[in-house]
Amino acid sequence: MTENIHKHRILILDFGSQYTQLVARRVRELGVYCELWAWDVTEAQIREFNPSGIILSGGPESTTEENSPRAPEYVFEAGVPVFGVCYGMQTMAMQLGGHVEASNEREFGYAQVEVRTNSALIRGIEDSLTADGKPLLDVWMSHGDKVTAIPSDFVTVASTETCPFAIMANEEKRFYGVQFHPEVTHTRQGMRMLERFVRDICQCEALWTPAKIIDDAVNRIREQVGDDKVILGLSGGVDSSVTAMLLHRAIGKNLTCVFVDNGLLRLNEAEQVMDMFGDHFGLNIVHVPAEERFLTALKGENDPEAKRKIIGRVFVEVFDEEAFRLEDVKWLAQGTIYPDVIESAASATGKAHVIKSHHNVGGLPKEMKMGLVEPLKELFKDEVRKIGLELGLPYDMLYRHPFPGPGLGVRVLGEVKKEYCDLLRRADAIFIEELHKADLYNKVSQAFTVFLPVRSVGVMGDGRKYDWVVSLRAVETIDFMTAHWAHLPYDFLGRVSNRIINEVNGISRVVYDISGKPPATIEWE
């Protein structure tokens, strides 16, 4: 009998904070399963989920407004620990008899809170001490409103000069509220506070580990599909690759992977995918060379969004044709991950944040009577990578920089032509190779090359040439929502430029993109 890794679970109610997914990831890092739901859930839904504890997230609304979101009353009647973060603390305080007021000044950034009373939430946790020996905690604040009176059965655990109730607690009911964000790295002891809540107060065991997740996923796949055949669109990206490895472990040769080579991949990527999954791991793969079909469909198209739609449409057409050629396939597998499915649980009020979906196969074709297998749908990206390592996939593949779903189709500006893709592939390979050689690849978050459809005069030997321009792009970011351009060394950039111009016949000029996000986006299209 496989161990139930969902036995202990935390429910996170989302009030719209940009950090809510980070809260969930932190809980998972502690080895505990959690789910992220919109704030307006019903009592019946909470009862059915049967959480060991509940976390109320932050959010952009003001509890002083009449129609601002509130936690369901049952949250405070369920008999489980509750942890309110920022807005979550404010709505907890207000709903349980305290008072919240709009502050004249928004408090955003680093702060030190002074501990007044001991609490199970911060037992043994401190960053420094005051002159008279009281513990201090370095935290990250981000709030406008503040609690001005706590409920009568709560105590003040910690405060700052401007925030009289930075931490409040009702130890008997195991209700806790903090006016800062323990999930962000700027709150130095935040992870330990979350650990106190999840592991000590909620008494959750660390059952959510890569090895146990794999065992659970394999068993669930076998229960779902039995001896049936399954088809998967394998792109060579992280999600589809880990999905393929899980399915292969679960059902072996009953899995058929379809690899569509659209001509928009990185240098030698098609060969690498076939070698790794076909020859090395022994998966059953159908290789579909479709470069000409994609490039024909893209001919004459300059609009980025139109190019994305064309690439997506042609991929589905090619994949469907291959699927129909296979006999007795009853299941379609997809590399859907947890952020992809959060949107479906978003509140109809629009208060909960919406997560952009990833590029998957695009849904089941109407003619195909197949069931859907999604073994990664409970996992965040970092968890997918960890189980990929456990399954034997190479680190360099799992942790390489993001590559857009449409591939080079959106890194060749304007019309996509084979000539442009071939030049871009070679230039980009040189850039990435040099980043690795200089030990810079893992010091930037994403790096790539863009093909610009403009010609520039160059000099080679005694002659002049009139060839194409490429731009190098490298950024540093934590969440890809904002990004700084990477300050790569001048001698490094010079070396990359010289290699590209000398080794890639057809490129005469290399430029470096120094735009941040915002105002620019990371990708050019």
UniProtKB/Swiss-Prot annotation:
Q: What class of enzyme is it?
A: ligase
Instruction: Quote a single Gene Ontology cellular component term.
Output: cytosol
Catalyzed chemical reaction(s): XMP + L-glutamine + ATP + H2O = GMP + L-glutamate + AMP + diphosphate + 2 H(+)
| InterPro entries the record matches | Class_I_gatase-like (IPR029062), GATASE (IPR017926), GMP_synth_C (IPR001674), GMP_synth_GATase (IPR004739), GMP_synthase (IPR022955), GMPS_ATP_PPase_dom (IPR025777), NAD/GMP_synthase (IPR022310), Rossmann-like_a/b/a_fold (IPR014729)
Q: Name one GO molecular function term.
A: GMP synthase activity
Please list the residues that make up the active site: C86, H181, E183
**Which residues are in the GMPS ATP-PPase domain?**
208-400
What PROSITE patterns would the database entry show? GATASE_TYPE_1, GMPS_ATP_PPASE
Against Gene3D superfamilies, the record matches this protein to: 3.30.300.10, 3.40.50.880, HUPs (3.40.50.620)
Q: SUPFAM superfamilies annotated for this entry?
A: Adenine nucleotide alpha hydrolases-like (SSF52402), Class I glutamine amidotransferase-like (SSF52317), GMP synthetase C-terminal dimerisation domain (SSF54810)
Q: Which UniProt keywords apply?
A: ATP-binding, Glutamine amidotransferase, GMP biosynthesis, Ligase, Nucleotide-binding, Purine biosynthesis
Name the EC number(s): 6.3.5.2
Binding positions for ATP per the UniProt entry: S235, G236, G237, V238, D239, S240, S241
Which parts of the sequence belong to the Glutamine amidotransferase type-1 domain?
A: 9-207
The pathway to which it is assigned is: Purine metabolism; GMP biosynthesis; GMP from XMP (L-Gln route): step 1/1
Q: How does it assemble?
A: Homodimer.
Q: What function is annotated for this protein?
A: Catalyzes the synthesis of GMP from XMP.
Q: What is this protein called?
A: GMP synthase [glutamine-hydrolyzing]
